[in-house]
Amino acid sequence: MAQVEYKGTGRRKHSVARVRLIPGEGNITINGRDVRDYLPFESLILDLNQPFDITETKGNYDVLVNVNGGGLTGQAQAIRHGISRALLEADPEYRGSLKRAGMLTRDPRMKERKKPGLKGARRSPQFSKR
């Protein structure tokens, strides 16, 4: 018999995380590596564990993640978004608490594009008076 599996996709900046929750003892695997090997900062690990703290399900699920694109912070927040969506699929009762904490909202902020005639998105070339 196939085991129960809950899936969620999270996005943040240019990162996309495909998350699978399997009932287990709380192991988190990101791209085939342990979470402590993949994310070097404790703050990022705490960040992606927030949905479990809010729903009080820490240690109930093993998390398998495939994430690509962006940097470490964007990836951690994409994983958090994916975990929240997967938890919602596991139990719709969590919607209220996750929504209040802002875990289900896709953060729309992206890098602003470089404009022609400027050095960056907003920085203009150095001005010379003479």
Swiss-Prot record:
GO terms for molecular function: RNA binding; structural constituent of ribosome. GO terms for biological process: translation. Residues 111-130 have a biased composition (Basic residues). Residues 98-130 are annotated as: Disordered. GO terms for cellular component: cytosolic small ribosomal subunit. PANTHER family: RIBOSOMAL PROTEIN S9 (PTHR21569), SMALL RIBOSOMAL SUBUNIT PROTEIN US9M (PTHR21569:SF1). The gene is rpsI. Keywords: Ribonucleoprotein, Ribosomal protein. HAMAP family: Ribosomal_uS9_B. InterPro entries: Ribosomal_Su5_D2-typ_SF, Ribosomal_uS9, Ribosomal_uS9_bac/plastid, Ribosomal_uS9_CS, Ribsml_uS5_D2-typ_fold_subgr. This is Small ribosomal subunit protein uS9. It comes from Macrococcus caseolyticus (strain JCSC5402). The lineage of its organism: Bacteria, Bacillati, Bacillota, Bacilli, Bacillales. Gene3D superfamilies: 3.30.230.10. Belongs to the universal ribosomal protein uS9 family.
